[in-house]
Amino acid sequence: NFHFYFGQKMTPMNNLSMQYMENNLQFSSRNYLSQNFSTTGREFGLFVESNFELGKIGVEPKLAITSGDGMNSFGENSLDADVGGFKYGGRLNIYPFGYFKKGNTYLGHDLLREEKPKILVGASSSLNMGASHKVGEGHYNEDLLNEGTFLFYDTDSIGLARFPNYLKNNLDFCLKYKGFSMLIEYVNTAAYNLQSVALNNNATVLLDTTQIS
């Protein structure tokens, strides 16, 4: 079965715990990985989700195309508009011993107490084709520079804005059994298309970094 969504929702392209709603977290705030590599986790776009079984193995694929500019990506006024390109990505969750109990997957705890050990192994990847935010979940606003937004310029076309491509890959492992819950997450990020980039519009201050990770 397939489910299609269009609008603003939790994106599947982040680490697993960023799929949890705030009221379903195990602790009072999100973990450091989520805080450093995501913002709200909500994006605007088209989302396709499915789930099926291969024998006793559960498979849950998800795909997404978003604006690449995070929540409220159309901006609050004419000076706060979308910039850069779209973000493309997806997620694949595998349940080797079958799905968790209904309603127990996207919880930080094992509130429903899985009677047998249940495991989720997940991976996600996304490519933001023109990012203007440090984690690819926001868009440039000169009033929000201290919140991670930025604007680069092309050295070959003076005054023309230039945005790097931002790649993010995640790996997740979740185990739940009789009230015990364990989550391991890994993330790797990199930025590309940073050659011939300037930090100011008259191209006198050059960016000397070719990869950020």
What does each of the following model-derived ranges do?
Residues 60-62, 72-78, 102-104, 133-137:
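A short secondary-structure junction signal
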